[in-house]
Amino acid sequence: MKTIQLGEKVVVSDPCYELPTWCQAVIENVLPGEYDCKVITKDMGMWGIRNTELIVTKSGLVPELLTWEETPFDIGVDSGQAGVFSFESYRNDNHIKEVQFINGKSPFDGGYVPKENEDGEGWYEKMCDLTLSTDESAGTYDQGVVTSSGIGDGSYVLYTASKEGKVVGFKVDFLLEDEEDEEDDWDDED
């Protein structure tokens, strides 16, 4: 299972969006610390294995034992991915510049070229690398997790869980889940 560090303020969004954007969530009153990241997958036949949910919970808590509440936020997706990020690292090029590309080069080599010299575009390129260059179509860095969004773009439901007045869990539902979904436990050694 992969872990990340979250602060008291968290962004749940497609990483292509700048702040503020109407179809993202900025959640305050988060219990800071280490969080476990899980991706739930499902075999969608001709679509292949797809990510149906992203679940991020405070380490030591069991997601199935939490009470999840639907939020009023629509998590819009236009780049085929969404994630949970500590506010201070969101679209922060300086925060992510030491992270290497998975295959040693940008996933956009020979294709789309991010807008150079625009704040957040280097960070966005690294988020795309995590979803485009991994078998899981998902990945983490120290303060965030990003995953491909099921079958693609759309508007998705965000749930949160709280304990003692603090948010301790986030769940993005890509609207594909049912009882046959499989939990993908990432190995920290990847």
Residue spans of the language-model regions?
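Intrinsically disordered, low-complexity acidic regions enriched in Pro/Ser/Thr
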Residues: M1-D190
